[in-house]
Amino acid sequence: MSACESNDLLKWCVIGAGPSGLTALKNLLQCGIQAECLEREDDLGGNWYFGSSTSRVFESTKLISSKSLTEFTDFPMPHEWPAYPDHKQCLAYLHQYSDYFGLREHILFQNSVTRITPITRNHVRQGWQVDLEDGTTRNYAGLIFASGHNH
């Protein structure tokens, strides 16, 4: 089975719309797997979303790895940017990436996950029930956690 083959026709969930969540979402969709992303903030970017309740960057934050080592292989950072972009450029890059690959329409913003429970039938796991802070519940075939190492 290739990396893009799937026998499951149900939707997958990516939790977190930072760099890892965006790439996970893009790859699922490119493989033809139905997917959506749950993001607790009102916009994407994860840690690079300066000023959000979860961001840990400072006003002066810049990449500590060069853009050539940090950029996604299928979406290079602008050539005219410095070798070590600042946090505003990193966030802009993630927005450009999301727009280029059509990810934004698959992201559900301001959705905090409060609980995850396996869905089982006859003692066999069939998927996952995800409870959200607003009281709604969503069911998924699988989950990818991209919520950062502090969450």
Which residues fall in each region the model found?
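N-terminal Rossmann-like FAD-binding beta1-loop-alpha1 element of flavoenzymes
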Residues: 4, 9-37
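Core beta-strand elements of the Rossmann-like FAD/NAD(P) dinucleotide-binding domain
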Residues: 10, 131-142
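Short hydrophobic core segments
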Residues: 15, 137-151
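Short, solvent-exposed loop/turn segments at secondary-structure junctions
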Residues: 20, 42-44, 54, 75-77, ...
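Generic structural signal for residues in well-ordered beta-strands
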Residues: 35, 107-109
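Glycine-rich active-site loop/strand segments that organize a redox cofactor
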Residues: 40-42, 47-96
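A conserved short coil-to-beta-strand element within the FAD-binding core of flavoproteins
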Residues: 109-127
